[in-house]
């Protein structure tokens, strides 16, 4: 993309100056994209542990546009100017479907509509003002809406994987950005080493083995991000309470099942906070959140998802509910005072559209004559090999009054779970 095509630049604390074109500026200035300024990147709760964690999905989306463009421009497989342009705008729009409080809102959205934030992104790109502006700027709306969520049907599957894969620009940006704003220093990764050593094998993105140490650092950093920030016990306590508030208020207000584009765009962190404070069914929870009167973790342990009981815990809500009831019965308190939380920490990044085995990342090495030989990461990295299972955390939350008694009951009820390490409080 030639310099004279750029309209100007935006200064970003992570990537420095991000140049944007006039077409990109017109899309950035839409209500749909500007709404992301009012949706925190980490959702609610992280700022209660890391006070600097107030960054939003807007700057993250700009960072993805920047990295997506660099990756597309530097792939050895030559892309034309239109394809690079499409990748930049699709990465910019990949998060527009998020509801208020980001992933905390998603379970309620999915329960009420059967949709994910990716589905909502496609809907907004196709039906909101974005469609008219994209067409005016000579983009194909259908292609952009699918590419933005990694679902476009193309022989060039690696275009999807720039946005949605095991090592995509979304993850590259949020690891750097979340680390910077929280101050948790897990995110010191040389992402450009990854970008400049990527290639395409059988239509899939792959990383040159010369960058193996950087790829290993990337994977370990992602584990660190989940453990230190995303699934921090206090962050999860806040989010569990917020999920309760959302469910309670939705029974009266019905905001999660909106069929209106404009009504959905009205939902952001600010407007939803006001709704939850004013709704009688959620008001008391919001008062507790405002005073940082949070649920307390009374029991915590870790286990691995290959165990059959562990898998059922993760996938079967009725089993988790039954265990909550058993813990409450032993403690002689109401079931609603016990919450079993089982977040899953991804070891090797797994969320991708590759045709390879789950949790594996294509890598390759070059022979002397320049031939690229594909390998599996698990075959060449001793660091990655033991991380081929998901480490999961099981926590039991209750209020301060019942904390010690619930801890005792939880140990008895969960004694059959293959917990490898228990944390004492």
Where in this protein do the model-derived segments appear?
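Elongated alpha-helical scaffolds
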Residues: 91-92
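Histidine-centered, transition-metal-coordinating active-site segments
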Residues: 1-86, 96-425
């Amino acid at each position: 993309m030639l310099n004279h095509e750029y309209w100007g630049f935006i200064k970003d604390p992570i990537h420095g100056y991000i140049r944007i074109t006039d077409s990109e500026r017109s899309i950035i200035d839409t209500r749909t994209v500007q709404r992301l300024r009012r949706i925190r990147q980490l959702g609610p709760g992280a700022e209660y542990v890391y006070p600097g964690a107030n960054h939003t999905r807007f700057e993250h989306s700009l960072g993805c546009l920047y990295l997506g463009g660099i990756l597309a421009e530097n792939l050895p497989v030559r892309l034309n100017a239109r394809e690079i342009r499409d990748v930049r705008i699709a990465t910019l729009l990949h998060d527009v479907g998020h509801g208020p409080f980001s992933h905390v809102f998603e379970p309620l959205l999915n329960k009420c509509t059967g949709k994910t934030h990716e589905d909502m992104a496609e809907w907004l790109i196709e039906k909101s003002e974005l469609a008219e502006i994209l067409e005016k700027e000579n983009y194909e709306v259908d292609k952009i809406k699918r590419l933005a969520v990694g679902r476009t049907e193309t022989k060039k599957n690696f275009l999807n994987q720039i946005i949605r894969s095991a090592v995509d620009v979304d993850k590259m940006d949020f690891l750097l950005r979340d680390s910077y704003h929280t101050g948790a220093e897990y995110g010191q990764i040389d992402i450009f080493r990854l970008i400049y050593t990527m290639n395409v094998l059988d239509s899939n993105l792959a990383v040159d083995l010369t960058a193996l140490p950087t790829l290993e650092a990337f994977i370990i950093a992602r584990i660190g991000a989940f453990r230190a920030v995303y699934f921090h016990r206090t962050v999860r306590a806040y989010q569990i309470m917020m999920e309760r508030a959302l469910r309670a208020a939705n029974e009266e207000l019905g905001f999660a099942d909106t069929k209106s584009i404009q009504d959905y765009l009205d939902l952001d962190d600010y407007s939803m906070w006001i709704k939850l404070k004013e709704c009688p069914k959620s008001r008391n929870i919001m008062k507790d959140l405002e005073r940082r009167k949070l649920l307390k973790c009374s029991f915590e342990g870790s286990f691995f998802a290959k165990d059959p009981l562990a898998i059922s815990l993760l996938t079967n809500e009725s089993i988790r509910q039954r265990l909550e009831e058993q813990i409450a019965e032993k403690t002689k308190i109401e079931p609603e005072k016990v919450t079993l939380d089982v977040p899953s920490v991804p070891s090797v990044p797994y969320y991708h559209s590759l045709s390879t085995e789950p949790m594996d990342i294509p890598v390759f090495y070059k022979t002397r004559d320049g031939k690229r030989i594909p390998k599996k990461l698990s075959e060449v990295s001793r660091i990655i090999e033991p991380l081929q299972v998901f480490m999961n955390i099981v926590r039991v939350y209750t209020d301060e009054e019942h904390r010690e008694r619930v801890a005792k009951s939880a140990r008895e009820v969960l004694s059959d779970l293959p917990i490898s390490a228990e944390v004492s409080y």
